[in-house]
C-alpha cells in the first residue's frame, strides 16, 4: 500500500501545482477591438519580433468631466473664474490619478519585465518601449504590418489587445495598437504652377488671387502699437515631413508683405522632427502656414513646431531598427504640456486632420482632453476644419458600410476652434469643400447650444439618419480658403484648402492677444465660449454657398444626391459664425476683463 499511497501523494501534489499555476496566470480583458481591417489598409506579414515600439498608455481620469467643465467656465465671459488660467503643475495635480491606480499600472509593467529605463510616468499617461515580441505577450495579441493603399505607408498595428483584469478598469487606451489613421494635410492641389502676376496686379484683383494685403483689406486688419511680447508666441504645427524653408519665407515677405521683412520664425523639433532646407520634397503646406501666419500677425514671435512620427515603421532589410510611434498628435501635445508656462505658445495653428471614424474613440477622447489642458493654460488651439465637405466617401468603416456624413477630427473636438473656408469677396461665400457637420464622438458643448439649435430648426428633417444632431457642431468660424499665393522651392504657386483658413484666423487671434496684453489684460486662451457669446458680433455672416461631398470614386456622382450643408443666416456647419471683422473683434476682446 505504501507505493500506492506515495503515488497518490505525487499526483495530488502535481494537481495542486497545476491549479496553483493556473491561478497565478491572470485572466485578461479586451481593451479595444476592431471588427475588421479598416478600409484602405491591407494586412501583410507578422511584424518583426525585434521591432521596438514606443507605447503611450492613458489611464482613465476620474475628474475629466469636472476638469473640462472648469476649462469652459474659465473661458466664458461673465463667469467668476473667467481668465483664471491654470499653471502646469496645477493641471497635473488636478488630473493626477489616485496613487493606488498609478502603482497598479506601473506594477503590471514591471511584472512584464518592461525595461525600467523606458518607463516614463506623466500624470495619467505612461510611456514605455518594448519589442514586438514582448508587446504581444503583454497584450495577448499579434502585431502585423499593414499598408495603406493610397500612400503605401506601412504601420505595425493589431486589431485587438487585452490587459489583466485587475488593471483593465484603470486603462483608457494603449497606442499605437488599433489606431490606423494618420493626419493628412487639409490642402487642395495647387491650382497652377509657374510665376503669377506682379504684386500690384494681385492686389488689384483679390477675387482671383489672395495675398496678405487682400486679407488685411477684406478683414479690416490694421497695425497696432503693440510690440513683440514673449507671452504672445504664435505657433504653427508641422507634420508629415513638411519643412518651413527660410529662403522661401524671406522671398514671400519681400514680395507680398513688404512691411514685414524683419519678421522671421524659430524652429522647435519634437520627436526628432526635421526642417530640412535642401529637401526636394514639396513643402507647400509648411510654406502656406508660416507665410500667412507671420505676415498677418503683427510682430509676433513665431515658432514652427516640426514633429516626427511618419512611417514606414517596418525597416527595410539591412536598415537600422528604429523606435516607431506614428502618433504625432500625442508627441506634440505631450511636449507642449511639459513646457514651463512661460514657454507655451499663446496660439497654435494646425492644418491637419482625418476622418473622425478612423480614430478610436478612446484616442479622440484622450487627445481632446490634452487640447483642453492646453486651453486651461491659456493656449488658443486653431484647427482647419478639413476639405471633404459633408464627407469624402460617406461610408462608415465599422463593417456595416452604412451611408453617413463623416465629421473630421480634431476639428470635432470641443476644445479647439475649427476654421472653415470661404471664397469670393463681394460677397464672401461658403466654399464647397469646407468640412463641417456634427461629431459622432463628442456631444454638443453648452457654449454652442443656442447657435447650433437654431441651424437644426432651419434644417428640419433633411438628412435625418445621416448625422448626429446632438453632436458637437463644427466649424466655429471661417476665412478665405482658395487662390492663396505661396512661394515654395522658389516657385510661386496658388494653393487652397482650409489649410489656408487656419493660419489666417490664428494670426488674427494673435493680434487680439497683443492688444489685450498691451492693455494689461491676459491672453484669450480657449476661444469658443467667448466667440459664441458674441452672437456673431464681429463676424460677417456668410449666407451664400454651401458644402458638398459623398462623391463616388473620382466621378461627380454623389452617393447621397445633393449632399450638402448650406450656408444660412446664423451659425452653419460650413462657415460657423462667419468670417472675422478685426476692427470690431479687437474692441470686443479688449473690453472683456481678466486682469493678471
From Swiss-Prot:
Sugar-bearing residue positions: 205, 264, 322, 365, 535, 562
Residues covered by the Peptidase S53 domain: 209-592
Record: residues binding Ca(2+): 541-542, 570, 572
Stated pH dependence: Optimum pH is about 6.
Cofactor comment: Binds 1 Ca(2+) ion per subunit.
Propeptide residue intervals: 17-201
Signal peptide: 1-16
Active site: 285, 289, 499
Broad class of where this protein is predominantly found: secreted
Catalytic activity of the protein: Release of an N-terminal tripeptide from a polypeptide
Cross-referenced Pfam families: Peptidase_S8 (PF00082), Pro-kuma_activ (PF09286)
SMART domains per UniProt: Pro-kuma_activ
Keyword terms, alphabetized: Calcium, Glycoprotein, Hydrolase, Metal-binding, Protease, Secreted, Serine protease, Signal, Virulence, Zymogen
UniProt function note: Secreted tripeptidyl-peptidase which degrades proteins at acidic pHs and is involved in virulence.
Name of this protein: Tripeptidyl-peptidase sed3
Protein source organism: Aspergillus fumigatus (strain ATCC MYA-4609 / CBS 101355 / FGSC A1100 / Af293) (Neosartorya fumigata)
Amino acid at each position: 500500500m505504501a507505493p500506492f499511497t506515495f503515488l497518490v501523494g505525487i499526483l495530488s501534489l502535481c494537481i495542486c501545482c497545476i491549479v496553483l499555476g493556473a491561478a497565478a496566470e491572470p485572466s485578461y480583458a479586451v481593451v479595444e477591438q476592431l471588427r475588421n481591417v479598416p478600409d484602405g489598409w491591407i494586412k501583410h506579414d507578422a511584424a518583426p519580433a525585434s521591432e521596438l515600439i514606443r507605447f503611450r498608455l492613458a489611464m482613465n481620469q476620474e475628474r475629466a468631466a469636472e476638469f473640462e467643465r472648469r476649462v469652459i467656465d474659465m473661458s466664458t465671459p461673465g463667469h467668476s473664474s473667467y481668465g483664471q488660467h491654470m499653471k502646469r503643475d496645477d493641471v497635473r495635480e488636478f488630473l493626477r490619478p489616485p496613487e493606488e491606480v498609478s502603482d497598479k499600472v506601473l506594477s503590471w509593467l514591471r511584472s512584464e519585465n518592461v525595461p525600467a529605463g523606458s518607463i516614463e510616468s506623466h500624470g495619467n499617461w505612461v510611456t514605455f518601449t518594448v519589442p514586438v515580441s514582448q508587446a504581444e505577450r503583454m497584450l495577448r495579441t499579434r502585431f502585423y504590418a499593414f499598408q495603406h493603399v493610397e500612400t503605401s505607408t506601412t504601420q505595425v498595428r493589431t486589431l485587438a489587445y487585452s490587459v489583466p483584469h485587475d488593471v483593465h478598469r484603470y486603462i483608457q487606451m494603449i497606442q499605437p495598437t488599433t489606431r490606423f489613421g494618420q493626419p493628412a494635410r487639409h490642402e487642395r492641389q495647387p491650382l497652377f504652377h509657374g510665376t503669377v502676376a506682379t504684386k500690384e496686379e494681385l492686389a488689384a484683383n483679390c477675387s482671383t488671387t489672395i495675398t496678405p494685403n487682400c486679407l488685411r483689406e477684406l478683414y479690416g486688419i490694421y497695425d497696432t502699437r503693440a510690440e513683440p511680447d514673449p507671452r504672445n508666441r504664435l505657433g504653427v504645427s508641422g507634420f508629415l515631413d513638411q519643412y518651413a524653408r527660410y529662403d522661401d519665407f524671406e522671398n514671400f515677405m519681400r514680395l507680398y508683405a513688404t512691411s514685414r521683412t524683419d519678421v522671421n520664425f524659430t524652429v522647435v523639433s519634437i520627436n526628432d522632427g526635421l526642417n530640412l532646407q535642401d529637401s526636394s520634397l514639396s513643402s507647400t503646406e509648411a510654406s502656406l502656414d508660416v507665410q500667412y501666419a507671420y505676415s498677418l500677425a503683427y510682430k509676433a514671435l513665431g515658432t514652427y513646431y516640426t514633429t516626427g512620427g511618419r512611417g514606414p515603421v517596418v525597416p527595410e532589410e539591412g536598415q537600422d531598427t528604429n523606435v516607431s510611434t506614428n502618433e504625432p498628435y500625442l508627441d506634440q501635445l505631450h511636449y507642449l504640456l511639459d513646457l514651463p508656462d512661460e514657454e507655451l505658445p499663446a496660439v497654435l495653428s494646425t492644418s491637419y486632420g482625418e476622418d473622425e471614424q478612423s480614430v478610436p474613440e478612446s484616442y479622440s477622447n484622450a487627445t481632446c482632453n490634452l487640447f483642453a489642458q492646453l486651453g486651461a493654460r491659456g493656449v488658443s488651439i486653431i484647427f482647419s476644419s478639413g476639405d471633404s465637405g459633408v464627407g469624402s466617401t460617406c461610408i462608415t468603416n465599422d463593417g456595416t458600410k452604412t451611408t453617413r456624413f463623416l465629421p473630421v477630427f480634431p476639428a470635432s473636438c470641443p476644445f479647439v476652434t475649427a476654421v472653415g473656408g470661404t471664397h469670393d469677396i463681394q460677397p464672401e461665400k461658403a466654399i464647397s469643400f469646407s468640412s463641417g457637420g456634427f461629431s459622432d464622438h463628442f456631444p454638443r458643448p453648452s457654449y454652442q447650444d443656442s447657435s447650433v439649435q437654431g441651424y437644426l430648426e432651419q434644417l428640419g428633417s433633411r438628412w435625418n439618419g445621416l448625422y448626429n444632431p446632438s453632436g458637437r457642431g463644427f466649424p466655429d468660424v471661417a476665412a478665405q480658403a482658395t487662390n492663396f499665393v505661396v512661394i515654395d522651392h522658389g516657385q510661386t504657386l496658388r494653393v487652397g484648402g482650409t489649410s489656408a483658413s487656419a493660419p489666417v484666423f490664428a494670426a488674427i487671434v494673435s493680434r487680439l492677444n497683443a492688444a489685450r496684453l498691451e492693455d494689461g489684460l491676459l491672453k484669450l486662451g480657449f476661444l469658443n465660449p467667448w466667440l459664441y457669446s458674441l452672437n456673431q458680433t464681429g463676424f460677417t455672416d456668410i449666407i451664400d454657398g454651401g458644402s458638398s461631398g459623398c462623391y463616388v470614386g473620382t466621378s461627380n456622382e454623389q452617393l447621397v444626391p445633393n449632399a450638402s450643408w448650406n450656408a444660412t443666416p446664423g451659425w452653419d456647419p460650413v462657415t460657423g459664425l462667419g468670417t472675422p471683422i478685426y476692427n470690431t473683434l479687437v474692441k470686443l476682446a479688449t473690453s472683456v476683463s481678466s486682469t493678471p
